[in-house]
Amino acid sequence: MDHAVATADEPRASPQRHLRWAEGVEAPAAGMRLFYPSGFSVSLDVPEAIAQFGHTADQITAILAAGEKKASKSPMAISKEHSAALYAYTEDSPLYRQLNYAMRTPSTPSNPTDNQLKLFADYIFHAERALNCMPTHVSSIAGPVFRGVNTLLNPAIYAPGKRITWQAFTSSTRKQAVTLTFLDKLPGRKLQGSVFIIQSSTAKDISFFSEYPHEEEVVFAPNSGFQVEKVLRTEGEKQSVLSDLAAYDMSDLDVYLLHQVA
């Protein structure tokens, strides 16, 4: 698989986009979570579902226009509404921040995220249906996908052999260099954070419908499960699998090899 060579001028992600790519990695041992209340049936269309996140009428109109434009040029069959649902997820807006927080955070009396999930259930439904229209990224054919986060994680949770679940929608990319946007860069061209190199079996390529198509985003559906195959320790090991990042010092970068199991 070809990758663009990384440079020191890689764009920086906004704090919000850092969150979209990083959320849900700190507590992956909680298992699967139900996102639809008992007896759920869809009651909101896509524009109404997006409005639950606080979008204005003008913002929703713009999202629908972008979705319609992308759907009209799409190489795969998809409705303009489902196209808009995907586009809304990739925007720099409160939607994904509120959504992923509610999906990954246990509900407590002081923080009743289950109440938020009831508000967001229609959007989750539409987004999952939209993902089903997307091409599947099968790593045995198309190569691994990559996820970079500017966080160092508990090594006990991500130890080799561990099974983990990422409950929320999870973003990754086909391009190694895109992970630089979501890592911390320290003096001396040193990278800090964590990179996951993932063998995918069901993730969906949404890059055509993204606000940032250059990121070549591939999304894992909620409750995707993985096994930690290996943690790379040496600079040589890291450079061998992250050749596009070889110009950087990766001594403070944790690199995990994951295999999707669910």
Please provide the spans of the model-predicted regions.
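Intrinsically disordered, low-complexity, charge-biased terminal/linker regions in eukaryotic proteins
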Residues: 1-68
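Short low-polarity hydrophobic stretches
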Residues: 1-5, 146, 175, 228
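Generic detector of low-complexity/intrinsically disordered segments
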Residues: 3, 21, 34-36, 46, ...
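Internal glycine-rich, Lys/Arg-flanked active-site/core loops of soluble domains
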Residues: 41-209
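Active-site and NAD+-binding cores of ADP-ribose-processing enzymes
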Residues: 150, 162-163, 173-180, 186-262
